[in-house]
């Protein structure tokens, strides 16, 4: 679990009054203490509180602590002494006793006071409970057992007829409170900038990027409440602690985003530019005193997937490497983060700490000090120390950040950081960018010299609702800034620039109008990309195996040719899909496992059976073929251009990151193997040609690629997509509105007729199913009778 893993390898055993054991545990921490040598504000506050508590600071029984809290109130309900003991007791009591058990002890004291006819003590007990409800009312909303015990107390007081006491311990106002911890600072549009706010990564200044990352970090940090820190200590993990889980996901997401943005550039020079930009972002984060995001950025740049890029590092100036070394030294874990602790202690006003380091301190303190001292006394010193450290973190949330955030850029970054990669996947991309030298020993993913994934054992949970919300907000911001004529479309160039700000490397877009992208299309793009990378989309993953193809084969994912002599690509053992190495993790189609004994229809019977069904399915997804004529299926069926033909643009950003706009025509049929031999250049086959044209070739020099014929023993795998690439003037590709208006759509009567036909077919199938079930039952009955008859014959013989 990263930094915290060692502290959580074994479950904590509660110690009850063993002085020798407690001394051994305390002496186990020599000079390398988790706390800085110089006194901090928390230590000074702790010393003052110890003095104010007097004899209780050395340890006291639980009953004495409860009695001291009750006696803190006078007859009118006012505090007659410091509230420090009340604060410590009501916030940290869960370390030694649950909230319901503490309230049960208070109820017992109330019953004893009633029995002794002591109304003054009963009133003070109710004042204590009222203080608990008023100051820490969140406990009563989150703890079901505490709520049930409180209801028992209210029923007891009501049964005794004490109306004043009932009003004091009333909890009905809790439900009226807005207990969600939302960021009070409103996001304002950055109107101080003269230029238009850019949503493009390449146009963002390091200062802008660092400010908005700080805003997101502070927004997440501010939502971690006092009880969240306490729950982390008591439960020993961040499960069932959503605010802390989100903080972990943000920190790890920023680190992955930094790595992927560097690796998304195709050349070493461009990768070096992104690397330099993130170093400048780190410098700005240091100036803003945002150490948590600084740790994430530097950790991402120091990760082995980036540090191994020798060609990229050769383009990084010496001054930048020097700054990286200084930042790494600042955040180094040597001497228990002594450099960071010194720098953090010197900071004033707004600052965001490295949360993992301070949580490690809390765990060290929680594990090192016993809960109880000798004679069963509660270790008040431990409660005070934990209370002061948590309070110091909570007080940082009250200082507003010295920056102004732009709502649109916040939405863009929020979606960009929704990443769900593993280290192996990132390292694979790094190896694809710069293959390792065969003479050098193979590298494996290693941890950076600074701690980033301080709780790497906790992986963010991809939530479809959250992703959908982030996508919708980002799309609204994109059209607000780039849809100038407000017609609901943005240009292809603008979309490609925006998409370059994300580490998504491949996705398919259906376009209503060539050259323009609508709101629905860009929403579908990011939703599909997010679902792919958050592992939400594929319910049945493929079982890809590296394969050597003996005949020409195309990738079923990107329609590209599988080049090479041996091991050209990957083939799914279950469904037979073929793809490139870089495409196998980007497949959006689920694995459709083949039947063991498929029924092979004859070549002549092409109008019925699975072949015709697959062809009719494939016809709905057909794309424009050459304009000279209809595209012909390999089995001889031709499909004319019509309303069922759709344009599709595929963004290809593979290892070379070269974007190619493809117009695809998907041929769907059964075939025996993915590697059928086919004529490449020459005469037309019976099925018709597949044209690949280029501006450098004349009409006579056009390359014709013929589809392969149908095999007599087809497999249920769909034929690979074939790409029709055309280099043309973009203006000639834009369809006019008149053409779109003339597209024929089915009438209501035609749809109604088709529905009735399908219903009739469905009814007929139901009748056949019932007949088959009855036939099965009769055969089973005959079988059982036959078995009984054989048994009777055996007995007679």
Curated annotation (Swiss-Prot):
SMART domains: C1, EFh, RasGEF, RasGEFN. Its main location: cytoplasm. GO terms for molecular function: calcium ion binding; diacylglycerol binding; guanyl-nucleotide exchange factor activity; identical protein binding; lipid binding; phosphatidylcholine binding; zinc ion binding. Ca(2+) binds at residues 483, 485, 487, 489, 494. Residues 53-176 form the N-terminal Ras-GEF domain. Transmembrane segments: none annotated. Changing residue 506 to D: Increase of Ras activation indicated by increase of ERK phosphorylation. The keyword Kinase does not apply. Keywords: Calcium, Cell membrane, Coiled coil, Cytoplasm, Differentiation, Disease variant, Endoplasmic reticulum, Golgi apparatus, Guanine-nucleotide releasing factor, Membrane, Metal-binding, Phosphoprotein, Repeat, Systemic lupus erythematosus, Zinc, Zinc-finger. Belongs to the RASGRP family. The phorbol-ester/DAG-type zinc finger is the principal mediator of the targeting to membranes and is required for functional activation through DAG-binding. This is RAS guanyl-releasing protein 1.
